[in-house]
Amino acid sequence: MTFIDQLNAAWQKNNSLLCVGLDPDPAKFPAHLKGRDDKIFEFCAAIVDATADLVCSFKPQIAYFAARRAEDQLEALIAHIHEKHPGIPVILDAKRGDIGSTAEQYAVEAFERFKADAVTVNPYMGRDSVDPYLAYPDKGVILLCRTSNPGGSDLQFLDVGGEKLYERVARLASGEWNSSGQISLVVGATFPAEIARVREIVGDVPLLVPGIGAQGGDIEATVRAGRTANGTGLMINSSRAILYAGKDERFAAAARQVALETRDAINLYR
């Protein structure tokens, strides 16, 4: 089953557009986990198990694992999701951006080592930086387009032949680069007008939307701007607001409650 097939099935099965981001910061873990060697895996797996029926995808951020020499725990986490919660796609948030043999190795890392179902990619270097990932026909490739950070406007709003750079990325990603139908785009919840513009350009191409929760993006504006005609088309990511909802041994239950509330808030506007 391809990433897009999994995503479509998860949207329907779980009645959810929520993506839970897995950005584990041990400094914020409950005290009972802090001394354990595999605390990053244990924390993330508990969050996953508590929320898997409420989400359309999970998105581990590779830097949070690599910075603590915990890549083996990331491998174990993705394997855990695939084994215990089959059908929920895993997006490796790596934002790689290179070309040629280096990009090929990054694709091997994402899809063969970590066995992610999709990966985020920086398309700044053009099609050469995307093609190595598209060589895996069952995998998803999610390109940065209009990012949620304020500084994104420094480049993404530059005029390129009568359109903004982020619009050009959207046009390429939904057109000539996407003959295999594997590409999705990152568009930040902090900019709902741009979400609507990207949706206008790309049709039903899925959008990964960070920026709700701790970053302050508005759920109603996001959903109304980005939903497709059938009320799907979005992976609306929340990380910190869910991960760190609880401070004690019941942290996973607290995370579930916030995830449930977030999913239901999203569904109000579908």
From Swiss-Prot:
It is an enzyme of class 4 (lyase). Keywords: Decarboxylase, Lyase, Pyrimidine biosynthesis. SUPFAM superfamilies: Ribulose-phoshate binding barrel. One of its GO terms (molecular function) is orotidine-5'-phosphate decarboxylase activity. The keyword Lyase applies. It catalyses: orotidine 5'-phosphate + H(+) = UMP + CO2. Belongs to the OMP decarboxylase family. Type 2 subfamily. This is Orotidine 5'-phosphate decarboxylase. The lineage of its organism: Bacteria, Pseudomonadati, Pseudomonadota, Betaproteobacteria, Rhodocyclales. The gene is pyrF.
